């Protein structure tokens, strides 16, 4: 129940505060960006747990397994493996980068969370899976003509506004348009 409430809180915050892109299809774009932000916010919990447990951020086997599972789920809804990879390879990289930045900051004296770390297996990973499946559907539903440099730049601004670095924002928003 605690995990579900955490997920609802993160989602509500992301959707309530996601500014409109002002572009054609903006509702779909806003939902996609809000889900990207939610996934990144969950990465903060992952980072805190890994920091407290002295676990390395990079877990290439886990990342490969996630991508394989998402490709399988993507096929079920009509996406190609390339379409799934186009969205999720950058999302996984952005998550990893956000975790690395947070952990480096904590090691060098940035304020640390005051809450105890959550259980990676039982609490955090189910949230990552849930939001990733939502992202898959939103990616499928997004009209291809919505992808543009303007959309990508707007998404970067929204991600930065949620407290992520320009580097994380650039990586996470990269599938949304050329640039």
Regions found by a protein language model. Give the residues of each.
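Boundary at the C-terminal end of the N-terminal hydrophobic targeting segment
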Residues: 14-18
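Amphipathic alpha-helical segments within well-ordered protein domains
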Residues: 47, 71-75
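Secondary-structure edge/capping motif, primarily at the C-terminal ends of alpha-helices
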Residues: 50-54, 109, 142, 146
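Mid-length scaffold segments of soluble, non-membrane domains
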Residues: 76-114
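Glycine-rich, aromatic-bearing surface loops/beta-hairpins
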Residues: 139-179
